[in-house]
Amino acid sequence: MRIKLIAVGSRMPRWVEEGWQEYVKRLPAELPLELVEIPLNTRGKNADVARLIRQEGEAMLSKVQPGERIVTLEVHGKPWSTEQLAAELERWRLDARNVNLMVGGPEGLAPEVCARSEQRWSLSPLTLPHPLVRILLGEQIYRAWTVLSGHPYHK
């Protein structure tokens, strides 16, 4: 099983890349974590935002292979504790399908992406900056793995 974070937005600050890579390298080879960046469409004063979101959604879905699981990160998704995420990670592993975690742009995910989602996950009721979400996701996937493997990282 491979986990891909498919996120709208690119050219993140260096600290974001370093934070993400820190957790990627901590994970074992049998749980690869990959980042796929979808360029954010330019939003001008008179932009058709619905069209831009739809285009970003199409680009996101083009990175998903047939049969792979889609998990969207949404404000109204289900909040998971660390232990619940670890249980989900174990279910995903046993299912043996690749998992795609989908993070939309500033206006959220395209309806087409949400319609394909098998699970909706909310990190927090707070609005979080997109760069921070990447690091937070990397850390939480790592933490869930440590719970499953009995590693002392999560106490």
From Swiss-Prot:
It catalyses: pseudouridine(1915) in 23S rRNA + S-adenosyl-L-methionine = N(3)-methylpseudouridine(1915) in 23S rRNA + S-adenosyl-L-homocysteine + H(+). The gene is rlmH. It is an enzyme of class 2 (transferase). It comes from the Bacteria. InterPro entries: Alpha/beta_knot_MTases, RlmH-like, tRNA_m1G_MTases_N. Belongs to the RNA methyltransferase RlmH family. One of its GO terms (molecular function) is rRNA (pseudouridine-N3-)-methyltransferase activity. Its EC number is 2.1.1.177. This is Ribosomal RNA large subunit methyltransferase H. Specifically methylates the pseudouridine at position 1915 (m3Psi1915) in 23S rRNA. It is found in: Cytoplasm.
